[in-house]
Amino acid sequence: MIPWDYNHYPFDAWNKNHTLDSAMSASVNWYFQTIDKKLGHGKIRSYLQQIHYGNESIDQSDSYWMESSLKISAFEQVSLLTDFYQNTFAFNPEHIAAVKDSIRLITHGKNTLYGKTGTGNVNGQNVNGWFIGYIENSQNTYFFATNIQAEQQASGSIASEITLNLLETMGIWN
């Protein structure tokens, strides 16, 4: 748990203490920025290189993952998720399990959906929406990454809607 610093943030859900699960669920930027400050840019850059995260380019800001120099494609996201799922990075298995638990969204029948949305905002407009994750069932694991970009109204929630509709049409999610 990381205690809230009593700064007023733009979303009520951010204005409290958070665990990994609650911070993932509410996309609490200050939670992850606090962890990043403890790690430092050198360690973060090293981790990004270790997992081959997109172009591995981070600036010195504390929001390098939001509309900055760090870029990744949907194909790279799927590759990263697959490696994360199989823990080919050789991270502590307990840490991998904790992250998997924190992105578990719903179990429906024999399917469990894991995922994370993200929204990039520039000048007050949602211009970049992501939904990445995977679906587990008794036969297979299906990985996905959806990225939408527009001058406005491109959000993670819209990317999630599109993804789930496609997965339902394909018979993977119902």
Predicted regions and their residues:
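Active-site SXXK
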Residues: M1-I2, A23, F144
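Short, well-structured active-site flanking segments
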Residues: M1-P10, N92-I96
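Generic preference for hydrophobic/aromatic residues in regular secondary structure cores
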Residues: I2, E56-Q60, L105, G109-L113
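Mid-domain, small-residue-enriched loop/turn segments at the edges of structured enzyme/sensor domains
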Residues: Y6-L20, F32-Q86
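A generic structural signal for nonpolar/aromatic side chains embedded in well-ordered alpha-helices
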Residues: A23-M24, L48, V99, I103
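Donor/substrate-binding cores of folate-linked one-carbon enzymes
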Residues: S27
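Structured C-terminal helix/loop/strand segments within mature extracytoplasmic catalytic/sensor domains
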Residues: K37-G40, T82-N174
